[in-house]
């Protein structure tokens, strides 16, 4: 992420250690390294151990310098250079000085239309390195945390300082992205009772108020009057950068199909406040923490019986995300702990009962490009609870996000596990086209029931995208003991849309 063309001025060194006749036969006993840069001393000693006990000569001394310089550079010290000060060694101990560039001035090129105050706040952690030895790993960690806001692009590059020798000036470019974006999509991921065909419009704005903030609106509907509205907003308020955000959602439904005569309908209203903190970041890894609280008011009506069921749900949650990014491998993991309190406010009785439970969810995805255009993608989702959970928190083993050969309304449970193993090959790059085959399984169980139900399926599909347009199609077939509960002999799923980000 950081680029440089730094050079250091080094003093002329007299290699009197190796050239003096009195020490030609000396063996190397120890290497003393002096530097203001911080490294793992044990790891450095391990690198130099193979040279100990060998006869000191020009080749050995040069190899040691190369080894030390290379180690410092790999550990983030740009343009680090090891050299020997003038010295005489009579006991096989040599001294090495490692010179590294220090950070002088920092220039912010604000092409992202941020307010000066916001640009200054976000780069505060970078400015803390001024006057210190430049370590690209530490600087990259700070810059990547800013980049992870996904509001603008950021890049940095070093040049030799015009003010101080062996110092570097850092320029940070903040480049704005398209300020407004949208996405239109269609899919048949719904179910028969609430609408199989779903239509979604998403609108988003980046850097909405020029404070690196983000806002979005999501509107969704189905062919059977299920409607959803989601409003969200987030803004960084510290230099970490810690993010504060909120989300408001409203949904309504009317059950059709076999429920027409009962006139079943309902709605939900809710909100969520959260804080997101980046705990750790490198070029190939990331750890984030999110904590928040939420409120939901849910109402279900059966109008043919004049029956109304109401309940409120309050809760708090913690979410840990740990990700690893390599050239041929991405590994994403999320653990969420949710404490919920449900209050029953239905008009069936005067009883205002309430119940509380702790719910944990773990999601993992491994994407391994093991050979040329072939990838193995392993997806795992696990839900665990010690008590029966609210209907809104149930694990869904079927549907488009589970074992897709089964309808999403077939079953739900308190506990569950979903696993999808997919072999995928990329056929084209422009337009992008892939093909995959996969095996899916899900296991579901309720807290108060000992019996576990299992669902299995095999499938295949393809994804294509070009210039903002995308299309995903798949077909799956149920296998195993519960295959007779699959509504169709083969389930076809389709999603298509256009996104302008």
Task: Label every PLM stretch briefly.
Residues 70, 76-82, 104-245, 281:
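Outer-membrane beta-barrel initiation region
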Residues 154, 180-182, 208-215, 239-245, ...:
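Repeated loop/turn-to-beta-strand initiation elements of outer-membrane beta-barrel proteins
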Residues 168, 197-201, 227-231, 269-273, ...:
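Hydrophobic, lipid-facing positions within transmembrane beta-strands of outer-membrane proteins
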Residues 203, 462-470, 487-501:
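Outer-membrane beta-barrel "beta-signal"
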Residues 299-302, 306-439, 443-445:
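C-terminal outer-membrane beta-barrel translocator/porin domains of Gram-negative envelope proteins
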